[in-house]
């Protein structure tokens, strides 16, 4: 059973922006931290992945910017939460939360996210979430573009092989057949696309706290992020 986000109003919301490259642990760490503080977790990358998947399902070449842009008004994309509080993505009413995690969709997401009109199309939606909720929002341009006035900005990173290993293990757990070499190759290509795109390239905000998660356990990384949030907001995790 799905439930729509319940909006709050009339109070100043707290926003935590977490950016970083693919495989740095953004989603897992952000989700865990949000749960501990009772905040809404927003995985913006899932939205771009959903657009990439929509293009694939419609037979649209994501390198054809005009075709992708023309498709946007036709899409019905919903970010909702299930009874366990997990973020789920619906595309035209269908749950695509698993489909958007496939490696090929990751590359499509990187390409559609490089289209300026796509990013502009999604900016208001993402900012609205932060205006109406206490959020931990992760992505690649949250601290630099989406939430430039976030209460706290964190830039997560790790070595390419560490990130590829995490992504590889994550895919195996989800039953996706792949190889470590393939995941590493895709990750390096994704890094290149994300850092070199003209529209909102991946980079740390000038006032972001840099956090290298190389060699860290999940618990260590979550603990460090929670410490930073507590120091900045005065709120203690539950």
Residue ranges, per PLM feature:
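Pre-Walker A (Motif I) flank of P-loop NTPase domains
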Residues: 12-15, 132
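Hydrophobic anchor at the beta1->P-loop junction of P-loop NTPases
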Residues: 18
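P-loop (Walker A) phosphate-binding loop of NTP-binding proteins
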Residues: 21
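Conserved lysine of the Walker
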Residues: 26
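Hydrophobic positions on the alpha1 helix immediately C-terminal to the Walker A/P-loop
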Residues: 29
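N-terminal phosphate/diphosphate-binding loop that engages ATP/GTP or pyrophosphate donors
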Residues: 36-101
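Small-molecule kinase domains that catalyze NTP-dependent phosphoryl transfer to phosphate-bearing small molecules
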Residues: 81, 126-133, 140-145, 149, ...
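ATP-dependent NMP and nucleoside kinases share a basic, alpha-helical "lid"
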Residues: 97-174
């Amino acid at each position: 059973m799905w439930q729509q986000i319940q909006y709050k109003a009339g109070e100043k919301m707290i926003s935590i922006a977490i950016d970083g490259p693919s495989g740095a642990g953004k989603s897992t760490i952000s989700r865990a931290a949000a749960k501990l503080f009772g905040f809404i977790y927003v995985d913006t990358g899932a939205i771009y992945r959903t657009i990439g998947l929509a293009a694939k399902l419609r037979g649209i070449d994501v390198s054809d910017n005009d075709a992708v842009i023309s498709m946007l008004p036709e899409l019905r994309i919903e970010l909702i939460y299930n009874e366990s509080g997990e973020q789920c993505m619906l595309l035209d009413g269908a749950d695509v939360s698993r489909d958007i995690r496939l490696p090929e969709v990751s590359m499509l997401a990187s390409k559609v996210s490089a289209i300026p009109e796509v990013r502009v199309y999604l900016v208001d939606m993402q900012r609205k979430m932060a205006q109406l909720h206490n959020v931990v929002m992760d992505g690649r341009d949250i601290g630099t573009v989406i939430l430039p006035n976030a209460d706290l900005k964190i830039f997560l990173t790790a070595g390419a092989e560490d990130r590829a290993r995490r992504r590889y293990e994550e895919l195996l757990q989800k039953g996706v057949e792949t190889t470590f070499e393939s995941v590493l190759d895709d990750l390096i290509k994704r890094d290149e696309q994300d850092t070199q795109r003209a529209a909102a390239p991946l980079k740390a905000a000038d006032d972001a706290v840099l956090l290298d998660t190389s060699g860290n356990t999940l618990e260590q990384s979550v603990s460090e992020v929670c410490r930073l949030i507590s120091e900045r907001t005065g709120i203690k995790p539950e």
